[in-house]
UniProtKB/Swiss-Prot annotation:
Descriptive protein name: Omega-oxotoxin-Ol1a
UniProt keyword annotations, A-Z: Amidation, Calcium channel impairing toxin, Disulfide bond, Ion channel impairing toxin, Knottin, Neurotoxin, Secreted, Toxin, Voltage-gated calcium channel impairing toxin
Record-annotated disulphide pairs: 4-18, 11-23, 15-64, 17-52, 25-50
Domain notes per entry: The presence of a 'disulfide through disulfide knot' structurally defines this protein as a knottin.
A single GO molecular function term of this UniProt record: calcium channel regulator activity
The family this protein is said to belong to: Belongs to the spiderine family. Spiderine subfamily.
Tissue: Expressed by the venom gland.
Length: 69
């Protein structure tokens, strides 16, 4: 049975991260920002990467249905 990705792994949704982590995309607003940037100011893909981060008390938690039971 497939387990879950460890902390700091690349992810595209909460379900691939472990239950006590969530998939965090620090630059999820980058696409909006890029519209306003000059053509040469490209933001590297590495910065746009989402990764599994620890759940925290600010409500950043894993919302995947498979963990809800």
């Amino acid at each position: 049975d497939w387990e879950c990705l460890p902390l700091h792994s690349s992810c595209d949704n909460d379900c691939v991260c472990c239950k006590n982590h969530h998939c965090h995309c620090p630059y999820s607003n980058v696409s909006k920002l890029e519209k306003w940037l000059p053509e040469w100011a490209k933001i590297p893909d590495a910065l746009k990467r989402c990764s599994c981060q620890r759940n925290d008390k600010d409500g950043k938690i894993n919302t995947c249905d498979k963990y809800k039971n």
